[in-house]
């Protein structure tokens, strides 16, 4: 068996990636989220495949086909809610994974980090298009509002929006193409994940100290396969509790009303995992400015390696920057809350303050904190 594992052209790739991979001996549970994201992706592809067998991407029947899946298909309700809540679990793991990367300075592995940002954009695009497919009120109006933002692009904006819509409004053509893209993107994401892993295995994993761990490695299997399996069990338990006991807690009640272009919902808002970016978008009164801020709210992650001023990699031994980091986390939670609130006083001013704080902490305060710590430790 050992000979096959190490000699077979295909199996040896798996062996070098998941079995005999040299891993730092001290990586904590924060390093579990990569494997959990892989599990989430597989779950989403499988449940999505079974949903696609019964779903019809036509404005006249899309809403009814989802109802049919829940009522008439064997365990259709379970597959549908696993897919919907699986997206939420996916984003929880994604945010924790990115947060880990920021905390421990993993962004210094630039290729891996940039690939991760591309993956984040791809997953967000996939989730947005998936939210349109049930063709409820929030699906329709969410698609209308978000795609309409592209009209802010000078000169080509209006033409671009109508090209994406396939007409003069969100309609049958839009739904059909969104279904096509929503189906194909997860497979593209899977390929990008392999590239992400390829880049990671070029440098090896980071660790909680931020120090070079080449002199202290252990094989991935059995140590981290067992450790990851514990994470998988915890995730599956949380996932099934959410799916079986509280399937609608993260959804919007408006999406149980069929899409009606003549009736606008009182508060148009995306799924919870986009609310922080939506709050940043809404906090700027100018349309183009809002769109740029929305894109920059994610793209700013690409600047992290350039904004790293400290001589130490991780935040483990850097209390000032640690404080900034946790203020940033709190700020993101505030933005998430604001994104779900109506556009009125005092929510507008809270959203604007939180948006300014978000960019200021990343671009100004954390780099300054790094330099102060260098001076305190006399590392300059």
Swiss-Prot record:
The keyword Lyase does not apply. Its main location: mitochondrion. GO terms for cellular component: mitochondrial inner membrane; respiratory chain complex III. It is a multi-pass membrane protein. One of its GO terms (biological process) is mitochondrial electron transport, ubiquinol to cytochrome c. It is found in: Mitochondrion inner membrane. It holds the Pfam family Cytochrom_B_C. CDD domains: cytochrome_b_C (cd00290), Cytochrome_b_N (cd00284). Keywords: Electron transport, Heme, Iron, Membrane, Metal-binding, Mitochondrion, Mitochondrion inner membrane, Respiratory chain, Transmembrane, Transmembrane helix, Transport, Ubiquinone. Its cofactor is heme b. Binds 2 heme b groups non-covalently. Heme b b566 binds at residues 97, 196. One of its GO terms (molecular function) is ubiquinol-cytochrome-c reductase activity. The cytochrome bc1 complex contains 11 subunits: 3 respiratory subunits (MT-CYB, CYC1 and UQCRFS1), 2 core proteins (UQCRC1 and UQCRC2) and 6 low-molecular weight proteins (UQCRH/QCR6, UQCRB/QCR7, UQCRQ/QCR8, UQCR10/QCR9, UQCR11/QCR10 and a cleavage product of UQCRFS1). This cytochrome bc1 complex then forms a dimer. Belongs to the cytochrome b family. This is Cytochrome b. It comes from Microtus miurus (Singing vole). The gene is MT-CYB.
